[in-house]
Amino acid sequence: VVSMFSNAYTDVLVDTWSTGFDQADVEDVQVAGDDTKLYTNLVFSVAEATTQPIDASQMTAFHMDIWTPDPTAAPAVFKIKLVDFGPDGDFNTGTSEHEITLDDTTTPAMATGAWVSLDIPLSEFTGLTGRTNLAQLIISGDPNTVYVDNVYFYAEGGGGLTEPDVAAPTPTVPEADVISLFSDAYTDVLVDRWSTDWDNTEF
């Protein structure tokens, strides 16, 4: 994973989440204790990583979670653009980019009042011929209020990891309704052993 913004990972350097020339207001808020970006008055917003451009050459997909209270039925659209500045880091030379448009008919579909997880193969950004010097993430569209979380690039198929790098999700079922064998979230019943002498595994 190469993370731009997520409590689940260590983020790379992002110089700004809203440049002086874009048309949006952005603030850091918490939703149920989780850090989240809140965009209001959104026309288009530019996040820039120009000090240390992002190398996503080994990644295969882009992820973003979004939530909006605004209408998402046609003709509303939400757009995501990735821009690579090239080896010289100059916007005016060697730049490649591509924009993806999402609406209420795409997969996944835009929705109102619900988190939508976007997992977009980088191969769909067909105009993005370079991925080693990604310097801009641009979002735009008709939803003018958008919550954004978990913005990262990742390698599908596990990306070569041999063990998890984040904990399993915390259970949400009330303890009164649970009999737990093993969980930090509940009081466990007695389990004599997790691997018997006659099984065939290492523990």
Model-derived features with residue positions:
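Beta-rich carbohydrate-recognition modules and glycan-binding surfaces
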Residues: 1-203
